Amino acid sequence: MTVSINEVSKYFSKQTGTVQVLENINFQLEKGDFVTVIGPSGCGKSTLLKIIAGLDNDFEGEIIIDGERITKPSKKQGFIFQEHRLFPWLTVEENIAADLSLKDKYVKDKVKEWVEIVRLDGFEKSYPKEISGGMSQRVAIARALLRDPNVLLLDEPFGALDAFTRSHLQEVLLNIWEQKKTTMIFVTHDIDEAIYLSNRIVIMSAKPGKIHKVIENKLPYPRSKNSESFQEIRKKVLQQFEYGGLIQTSL
């Protein structure tokens, strides 16, 4: 399974004229890749993610997933937003099942499996208002992965969480990735998070958004943020921002 992002460009129309948001994005992922995307605000990270998800088909170029051109959302893509977007009138297990019936034994068993994977045992019958923000985001992760998507797209899913909860969910996500080998594309503003999670870091520049640099991250798992090798990669990433003009671009 591959994900191919080919010659993708995107324009927005404004009263003052047309603005190019993305320019000539080319990138490929193989099955099981974990890629993080970072860059200054306004460089089109979230826009690119929505294009890959099939949520935006007004663009130039093409997205190919497992040989199929993507023009709309499908079971090939799972998407996790910055907010969990749970249905407040549904329980945890009903939110994970979403539009599938829990009366179906296969669905019931799959939901049970994901409840265990994201460590929500005992909260199956709870409603979103009865659980924490971190737990709600775990429900969103389970919901997105229930249908075994080819690729999971994550748009800063931990950005609004406290440091402890974010660290915990990073471990949950890595455990899922190691178990299921799901291809992941994860947008973040956090350099340490990008290095900690992924095996490739895509750095984007802005105005218009384009790929500035791809850094291979071959650190073995599990990773320590305090290790010398981790800090070396962090230095490489920061150098791209400091000397690549990215900080100025974001001002």
Swiss-Prot record:
Give the family from UniProt. Belongs to the ABC transporter superfamily. Aliphatic sulfonates importer (TC 3.A.1.17.2) family.
Q: How does it sit in the membrane?
A: Peripheral membrane protein
Taxonomic source organism: Bacillus cereus (strain ZK / E33L)
Query: Which GO molecular function annotation, any one, does this entry have?
Result: ATP hydrolysis activity
* Pfam families per UniProt: ABC_tran (PF00005)
Q: Where in the cell is it found?
A: Cell membrane
Q: Where does ATP bind?
A: G39, P40, S41, G42, C43, G44, K45, S46
* Transmembrane stretches, start-end: none
Q: Record's Gene Ontology CC terms?
A: plasma membrane
Quaternary structure (record)? The complex is composed of two ATP-binding proteins (SsuB), two transmembrane proteins (SsuC) and a solute-binding protein (SsuA).
What protein am I looking at? Aliphatic sulfonates import ATP-binding protein SsuB
**UniProt cross-references to Gene3D superfamilies, sorted A to Z:** P-loop containing nucleotide triphosphate hydrolases (3.40.50.300)
Quote the SMART domains the UniProt record gives: AAA
Give the EC number: 7.6.2.14
Reaction(s) catalysed by this chain, per the record, are: ATP + H2O + aliphatic sulfonate-[sulfonate-binding protein]Side 1 = ADP + phosphate + aliphatic sulfonateSide 2 + [sulfonate-binding protein]Side 1
Q: Which UniProt keywords apply?
A: ATP-binding, Cell membrane, Membrane, Nucleotide-binding, Translocase, Transport
Every copy of the ABC transporter domain together lies at 3-231
